Amino acid sequence: MAYQFRFQKLLELKENEKDQSLSEYQQSVSEFENVAEKLYENMSKKELLEQNKEKKLKSGMSVQEMRHYQQFVSNLDNTIYHYQKLVIMKRNQMNQKQEILTEKNIEVKKFEKMREKQFKMFALEDKAAEMKEMDDISIKQFMIQGH
């Protein structure tokens, strides 16, 4: 008699859900990394711009150039603020996806444990049935020999 886990279809469904959650988590990690990279790039641009402004101030800078730099820094600050908000949002999404993935992993592990226990019970029952059958055969052989 072959072993058949009674919740196999449910286990497969849970595994599919886990795989889907893993895919969504990986996607959210990728999105978070992309947004964080954009934030870093913009912060680096601002730092470079500030350094260039300092150099130009020492060597002399027109009022027009100063306004231009100030406008550019202001725009960069707005962009940086936007990306900071996005980073926070993407981090929260990533954390939510990670929690969901953890829950799905736990569900799958429960079913795998259940399958393992059920298989052990099946193996024990099968072994007991086999031993009983062997005992029956031994008794029949003993009886046939005329004892």
UniProtKB/Swiss-Prot annotation:
GO biological process: bacterial-type flagellum assembly; bacterial-type flagellum-dependent swarming motility; chemotaxis; protein transport
InterPro entries: Flag_assembly_chemotaxis_eff, Flagell_FliJ
Membrane topology: Peripheral membrane protein
Full protein name: Flagellar FliJ protein
Function as written in the Swiss-Prot or TrEMBL entry: Flagellar protein that affects chemotactic events.
Protein family membership: Belongs to the FliJ family.
Disulphide bridges, residue numbers: none
Taxonomic lineage from the root: Bacteria, Bacillati, Bacillota, Bacilli, Bacillales
Compartments where found: Cell membrane
Keywords: Bacterial flagellum biogenesis, Bacterial flagellum protein export, Cell membrane, Chemotaxis, Membrane, Protein transport, Transport
Signal peptide as annotated in the record: none
GO cellular component: bacterial-type flagellum; plasma membrane
Entry-linked Gene3D superfamilies: 1.10.287.1700
Native organism: Bacillus subtilis (strain 168)
Gene (UniProt): fliJ
Keyword Membrane in record: yes
